[in-house]
Amino acid sequence: MSYVYTSLLLLAEVCEPKMLPTFCTFALCAVPPLRSATASPIHTHYPHAFPDTAQWPLARVGKALEQQLPGEDLQAIISEISQANIEATIRKLASFGTRHTLSSQTDPERGIGAARTWLTAKFQEAADASEGRMTVDWNSFIKYPGDNERIIFPVNITTVVATLKGSEDPERLYVTGGHYDSRNSNPIDYQGDAPGAVDDASGVAVSLELARIFARYRPKASIAFTAFAGEEQGLLGAEHLAQTYKNNSANVAGMINLDMVGNSKAEDGTSDPNNIRLFCQGTPLTEDDTSAISRVSIGGENDSPARNLGRHIYEVASNAFTEMTVRLVYRLDRYSRGGDHRPFLEAGYTGVRFVQPNEDYTQQHQNVTVRAGKQYGDLVEWLDFEYNTRAAKVVASTMWSLANAPDIPRNVGSNVTTSDNFSQFKWEAPVGLPPEGYEIVYRETIEPHWTSVIEVGNVQWYNLTSATIHKDNVIFGVRSVGAGGYRSPAVLPFPFGCTRNC
């Protein structure tokens, strides 16, 4: 029985009779009379009409890609993460009553000023153990009323930044952190309670705990552990810090936002304790028109720097040591929400956001109150401190792996001068820490993660002479490899030598 004939019979079973002439017109064939509803099914063998293969492309070049497990140094860092410290930080931040950006900056016990003073002291404690390699600074500015309806009088907005200088590649910087300001139902209520336990004391607690631990280690690249302010008023602190870095031509190689990483339960009580979401933007917000057109023509919309950073984080942080799986979400952020990674993306940097797997909106941006017997508000009692600690392990794996690998290769390209079955790649070494070699990774275009890897050595070009792994059928990436097997995120090769449609 022909495929068209069989398909039309299948349609006849599930569609209204009046639709059949339309299908028949498209198929250019005649449709046999409809069988009765009691007739035996005709599609018993349908699943076998298109047998899938265990692997496609049919031949693999290189080897199957395996996730990167932590070495002894990273295992030691993970083992030092203290659930008690994370809980104590969250409880302390919630105890300030409100940390609204417009709240008191002078009251020693209540308001954002008291929280900032306490956080600065705690970051400084970490720095004191670093033998001078970590410094604590304030990134401050005055925000005036104007086009922002959530700023109703001039206010000092201060982000606390603890920067750990890299031992071998100090000019390359990775930024991580959460926001320490909070809010309730009214975005300009700066006097009512807003404990902000999950949103976002949970993220700040991770940043502070990792600063404490990392200060006694020597990552090769620099890491900034931050606590942002002004997030609830429009990502203001992160925007100012990102622009400060940009104005100083800082090499920010990645920004990892930690915003709401403390609760695994949804509003209906569903628990998802071993997954964490990672939101990864698609086409870069600052990409020029030529690059954007080329990206679309080669099907690279899903291989932005942010998404390849996300794939890298999945590889290094989803394992038995973290007890978590990183779940990539191909979006900038959740619907109608924003986060402090966005200003970094808008400044031309690569940024992603960690978020817990479920959300309870009765606990977010809510007044602390009881309505119809139900407790509302972002309270400490909602926290799952074990989950928050596992999230910290994920972030520790991320930051250590990134900071100890070489930077991504530069100017990665794929030669399309001629039409053939082979692929030729070229790239340039990254600035800073020299790689020990490079790898070409690839996957089928519909796969979310890299599946195969080719080790090419310490070269800056490679000819792939296998006709079975064709550039039309897979997505390629090139990544740097350093000492200890630490790898950079992969970079999508853009075509060169083409005359049309690329």
Swiss-Prot record:
Binds 2 Zn(2+) ions per subunit. Its cofactor is Zn(2+). One of its GO terms (biological process) is proteolysis. Zn(2+) 1 binds at H179, D199, D259. It comes from the Eukaryota. Glycans are attached at N156, N247, N367, N415, N421, N463. It is found in: Secreted. Pfam families: Peptidase_M28 (PF04389). Residues 1-17 form the signal peptide. Belongs to the peptidase M28 family. M28B subfamily. This is Probable zinc metalloprotease Lema_P049800.
